[in-house]
Amino acid sequence: MSTGHVSTIDTPISPFTAIVAMDGAVLASGWTASADDLLPQVSPSLRPTTLAHRRDLGEVTRAVRAYHAGDLDAIADVRVRQRGGEFMGRAWDALRTVPAGKPISYADYALLAGRPTAVRAAASACARNAATLFVPCHRVIRTGGATGNFRWGADVKRWLLAHEA
């Protein structure tokens, strides 16, 4: 039996909720007011069996507030924990190296993740990313410059990209 902590923070976009492990690592996050939207995204082997609601998640809450207030690097050192195959892990790690204000294409993302021909797998890594914001999948766009898909909606992705520009 494991317990995760959850908190919702008001942001200029919409409420932002994060689920963190007992050690403070982010398991899932996104622009929603409901932990129920996030829990299914957590790998079953990491998924908490109970959630304890908190007003403040310490480092995570500070980073979310600072990021939305303009400190775009505030999210860089927040610990995350996700499970996926070897490529997924490399791809999520690679995403954390993409600087704010410098979006990349899915093809460039596949190259950065070490598999230049695996564009679909790179897109899948974005889609399966549970730790949105901290693993900034919003920084991956289509080759022609279109924003592409985003779990939390095109308006949220456009806001994030404009905020980081």
Per-segment meaning from a language model:
Residues 119-132:
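Regulatory, non-catalytic segments
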Residues 133-140:
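Short Lys/Arg-enriched helix C-cap and helix-to-coil transition segments
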Residues 18, 140-142:
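Active-site and channel-lining beta-strand-loop segments
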Residues 1-116, 165:
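Basic nucleic-acid-binding alpha-helical/helix-turn surface characteristic of O6-alkylguanine DNA
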Residues 143-165:
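…primarily DNA-binding HTH/wHTH and HhH modules…
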Residues 116-119, 160:
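LysM (lysin motif) carbohydrate-binding repeats in extracellular/periplasmic proteins that recognize
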